[in-house]
């Protein structure tokens, strides 16, 4: 493993965490929503966040950053730009105009589907999937399956926040996906 795949410095991780707002009982009672808006609004905290990801992946010999709909679309293109890589959007069903491949995944009540264009990548391309948060892990696992179906190598899943009590990070690791998260929160 190269030095680019080292952990985030504790002080930077704490700094990032201090810029994430917790909104109690939203979108429903009992949920502690982790709002990254303050992190994005302050130029310094956004720069620290992107620099952490750049430091991690600068020597990883990647071809693309893939971002999960929707907040992965905020961080992913910035990171791709900084690393001089392309960006692959992994969209909710029905949002992509060209030929696409789809993968459904389970939600607490029902299922959802994500899609990518069938020409999004080619066999052997090395990709990191990024999102703001890992909760149940379903969306990121579906993205991994889609990219691997096209022959890509998913090097790692990355997120700003891990909510380990929801089991997503465990599910993803057990499914063979290496993970990197900047910070974590207890609870939902």
Swiss-Prot record:
Cellular compartments per GO CC: cytoplasm
Pathway field: Purine metabolism; AMP biosynthesis via salvage pathway; AMP from adenine: step 1/1
MF (Gene Ontology): adenine binding; adenine phosphoribosyltransferase activity; AMP binding
EC number(s) on file: 2.4.2.7
EC class of the enzyme, as a word: transferase
Presence of keyword Transmembrane helix: no
Catalytic activity from the UniProt record: AMP + diphosphate = 5-phospho-alpha-D-ribose 1-diphosphate + adenine
Keywords for the protein's UniProt record, in alphabetical order: Cytoplasm, Glycosyltransferase, Purine salvage, Transferase
InterPro entries according to UniProt: Ade_phspho_trans, PRibTrfase_dom, PRTase-like, UPRTase/APRTase
Principal location listed in the UniProt entry: cytoplasm
Localization in the cell: Cytoplasm
Keyword Cytoplasm: yes
Quaternary assembly: Homodimer.
Stated family: Belongs to the purine/pyrimidine phosphoribosyltransferase family.
HAMAP family from the UniProt entry: Aden_phosphoribosyltr
Protein name: Adenine phosphoribosyltransferase
Organism in which the protein naturally occurs: Paraburkholderia phytofirmans (strain DSM 17436 / LMG 22146 / PsJN)
Native organism taxonomy: Bacteria, Pseudomonadati, Pseudomonadota, Betaproteobacteria, Burkholderiales
């Amino acid at each position: 493993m190269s030095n680019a795949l080292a952990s985030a410095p504790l002080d930077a991780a704490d700094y990032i965490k201090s810029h994430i707002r917790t909104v109690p009982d939203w979108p429903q009672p009992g949920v502690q929503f982790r709002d990254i808006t303050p992190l994005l609004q302050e130029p310094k905290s956004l720069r620290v966040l992107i620099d952490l990801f750049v430091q991690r992946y600068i020597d990883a010999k990647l071809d693309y950053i893939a971002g999960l709909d929707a907040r992965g679309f905020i961080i992913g293109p910035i990171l791709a730009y900084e690393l001089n890589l392309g960006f692959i959007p992994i969209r909710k069903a029905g949002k992509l105009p060209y030929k696409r491949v789809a993968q459904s995944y389970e939600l607490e009540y029902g299922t959802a589907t994500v899609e990518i264009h069938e020409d999004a990548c080619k066999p052997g391309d090395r990709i990191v999937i990024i999102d703001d948060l890992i909760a149940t892990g379903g969306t990121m696992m579906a993205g991994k399956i889609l990219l691997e179906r096209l022959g890509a190598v998913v090097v790692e899943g990355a997120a700003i926040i891990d909510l380990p009590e929801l089991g997503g990070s465990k599910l993803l690791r057990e499914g063979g996906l290496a993970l990197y998260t900047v910070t974590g929160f207890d609870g939902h």
